[in-house]
């Protein structure tokens, strides 16, 4: 993706999710052309910042899905994860808790279909 393409995507996202933002093209031409995403310094300084949200969300959706079938089992997994705290790596913690890896494509596909069905999409 070129820088110009990234700027266009950012402009579209801002228009959709933050329509109240109105850049003055004379005062902030860089931002009005879609460059505001570059103000998010953690994109550059902590590149896994946003990925962490995605991984956590997939694990949370796994627990949500399991809770629909067996709330007790889902709560046990969640409690185990909480008790383990930061005692190990992320992948080892979720494995010890009985949660599938969010890197598993089959897990992502399955959750996508289940969420889509739940939302009647």
Language model segments and positions:
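C-terminal, non-catalytic "cap/extension" segments appended to globular domains
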Residues: 1-121
């Amino acid at each position: 993706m070129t820088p110009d393409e990234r700027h266009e995507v950012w402009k579209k996202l801002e228009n959709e999710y933050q329509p109240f933002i109105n850049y003055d093209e004379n005062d902030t031409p860089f931002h009005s052309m879609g460059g505001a995403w570059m103000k998010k310094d953690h994109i550059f300084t902590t590149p896994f910042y946003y990925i962490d949200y995605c991984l956590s969300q997939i694990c949370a959706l796994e627990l949500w899905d399991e809770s629909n079938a067996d709330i007790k089992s889902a709560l046990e997994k969640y409690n185990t994860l909480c008790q383990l705290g930061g005692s190990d790596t992320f992948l080892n913690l979720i494995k010890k808790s009985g949660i599938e890896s969010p890197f598993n494509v089959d897990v992502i596909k399955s959750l996508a279909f289940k969420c889509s069905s739940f939302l009647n999409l």
